[in-house]
């Protein structure tokens, strides 16, 4: 028979390791077995916020103002994480997401995506049946502000080629970092290009496959 003290010690070690690893795992708030429909455009509705969201950071603070309710269902084609600049303190991850025909495996061979320095880039083959206007209007580089730590943990688990659903708000951000004023504005259209054309999303709910996180 195993000594009680030895058993208690082994159980304690197992429990400690379980708690340690669970700290980095997102906790599901629910399950949704309906198919994530990537064929439709994002849903955007005007929104006027009476109470901006304030985030305090070391050597700074941000005021986040929602300007539109937003829901995006699509396919992740690239993911980039950041940690070195002031932006990363509030938005540590960018997701390049496509929808419509771009999310159809039939067209994957024609268009490729990449990210760098808070930008996303695409390349398409000459024989592609999808022109640049379609590609631009059915893809977006999304700067993600997780509303909760749990959502932030869930976002870290997202992999390329996964279907996701993001719900929350398009937001504008103003504040200071290191004593310097900072501003970050969201795009409100899917048809713009260049500087300022990315969406800044305050995510209040994320669905990855069938798992829902809040």
Per-region residue spans from a language model:
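OB-fold and OB-like single-stranded nucleic-acid-recognition modules
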Residues: 3-10, 17-214
């Amino acid at each position: 028979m195993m000594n009680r003290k030895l058993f208690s010690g082994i159980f304690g070690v197992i429990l400690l390791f379980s708690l340690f690893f669970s700290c980095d795992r997102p906790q599901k708030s629910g399950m949704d077995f309906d198919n994530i429909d990537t064929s439709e455009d994002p849903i955007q509705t005007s929104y006027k916020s009476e109470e901006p969201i304030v985030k305090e950071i070391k050597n700074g603070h941000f005021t986040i103002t929602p300007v539109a309710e937003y829901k995006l269902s699509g396919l992740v084609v690239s993911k980039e994480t950041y940690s070195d600049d002031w932006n990363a303190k509030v938005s540590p991850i960018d997701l390049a997401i496509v929808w419509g025909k771009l999310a159809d495996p039939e067209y994957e061979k024609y268009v490729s995506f990449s990210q760098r320095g808070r930008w996303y880039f695409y390349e398409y083959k000459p024989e592609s049946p999808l022109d640049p206007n379609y590609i631009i209007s059915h893809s977006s580089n999304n700067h993600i502000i997780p509303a909760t730590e749990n959502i932030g943990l869930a976002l870290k688990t997202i992999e390329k080629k996964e279907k996701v659903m993001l719900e929350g708000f398009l937001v504008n951000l103003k504040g200071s970092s290191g004593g310097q004023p900072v501003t970050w504005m969201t795009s409100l259209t899917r048809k713009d290009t260049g500087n300022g054309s990315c969406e800044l999303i305050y995510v209040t709910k994320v669905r990855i496959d069938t798992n829902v996180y809040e």
